[in-house]
C-alpha cells in the first residue's frame, strides 16, 4: 500500500523515507519543493516510487489519484522561525496542512504531521495544554493554530491524526538548512574550520554555556513516527523531545571530543577544553536579550502514556554518532 511523505527531501522527511525503506517499505511517494535543488542529495540513497511537486500533489491526492494510501507523513513546511511574511507562512504551514488533513480524513488515511515546540513560545512549561501555548513568531502561530483545529476534529475523526511537537532535532541530512541547522552541525563545522567552538557566555542566571535545550536525535524522531504508524488507533498531539534538557556545553564537548578521537587524540574534560582554547565563550549579544529562551525541556508523559517506551539517545550518544556520520562524508 502507498505511503506518502511530504517534505521528503528535507531533514526529517528524508530520514523518515530512509526509515521506511529500512523496514522494507519502498512504495513511497516523495513530495517536496525542489526550488532549493541541493536537497535532492538527501534522497539519493532512498528508494521511492515517485516524486511530486508539493503544488501538484495536493489536488491530485484530493481527487484520489493515488488509490488507497495507508499514511501521509506531513513534514513539509517553512521552518524558518525568522520568516516575517505571515501571509506566506499561514498559506504554506496552516492552509496547506488543513487541506491535506481533510483529504486524509475523507479517504481514511493515517495523518502524521510535524508540529513544533515553537507553539510554547515564552512559556516555562512545555506540556500539551492550551494554557502553556504562547507562540512568539508567525511560524509558531501557524503550527499552534493548526493544532487547535486538530483538537476540534479529533473527537469525530474516524482515522488517525497525530501531531508531533519537535524540540531541538539534530542529525544526518540537515546540511541544506543553512543557519537553521542544528547547533551540533554548526559546532562541528566551526571546529573543523577554526579549531574552536564558541558559545554564549553568562546570561539569564546561567553560567557560560549552561543555557539548555531538549536536544533530540532525528533517529529517535523517526522511531516515534514509526511507532504511531504501527498503532493507527493512537491519535493526539505529542511532545517529541527526550524529556531531558542538556546544556550547550554538552553539545560542544561531544563534538570536539568526537573529532579529537577521530584524529587519535585523547578526550578532554570541559575545563580542559576551555583551558586549551578549544571552547570559548563570547559575550551574550544585546540583540537577543529578552528574546532568548535559556531553558526548554519537553514533558513526555503523554507520549509515554500513549505506549512509546523506548529510551532516547543522550547528547553524548546521539551527537557523537552524528559527528562520526559527518566525518565519514567529509572525507
From Swiss-Prot:
Enzyme class name: isomerase
Task: Name the positions where NADP(+) binds.
Answer: 11-12, 32-33, 39, 54, 75-79, 92, 143, 169, 177
Q: Which reaction does it catalyse?
A: ADP-D-glycero-beta-D-manno-heptose = ADP-L-glycero-beta-D-manno-heptose
Active-site residues? Answer: 139 (proton acceptor), 177 (proton acceptor)
UniProt EC number? 5.1.3.20
Keyword list (alphabetical) reads: Carbohydrate metabolism, Isomerase, NADP
Report if keyword Calcium is assigned: no
Annotated substrate binding lies at: 168, 179, 186, 200-203, 213, 292
Record's cofactor remark: Binds 1 NADP(+) per subunit.
Q: Which pathway does the record list?
A: Nucleotide-sugar biosynthesis; ADP-L-glycero-beta-D-manno-heptose biosynthesis; ADP-L-glycero-beta-D-manno-heptose from D-glycero-beta-D-manno-heptose 7-phosphate: step 4/4
- Supply one GO BP term: ADP-L-glycero-beta-D-manno-heptose biosynthetic process
| Role this protein plays | Catalyzes the interconversion between ADP-D-glycero-beta-D-manno-heptose and ADP-L-glycero-beta-D-manno-heptose via an epimerization at carbon 6 of the heptose.
**Complexes and interactors:** Homopentamer.
Similarity comment: family membership: Belongs to the NAD(P)-dependent epimerase/dehydratase family. HldD subfamily.
Q: Which PANTHER family match?
A: ADP-L-GLYCERO-D-MANNO-HEPTOSE-6-EPIMERASE (PTHR43103:SF3), NUCLEOSIDE-DIPHOSPHATE-SUGAR EPIMERASE (PTHR43103)
The name on file for this protein is ADP-L-glycero-D-manno-heptose-6-epimerase
Per the UniProt entry, what species is this protein from, by scientific name? Cupriavidus necator (strain ATCC 17699 / DSM 428 / KCTC 22496 / NCIMB 10442 / H16 / Stanier 337) (Ralstonia eutropha)
Write the gene name.
Answer: hldD
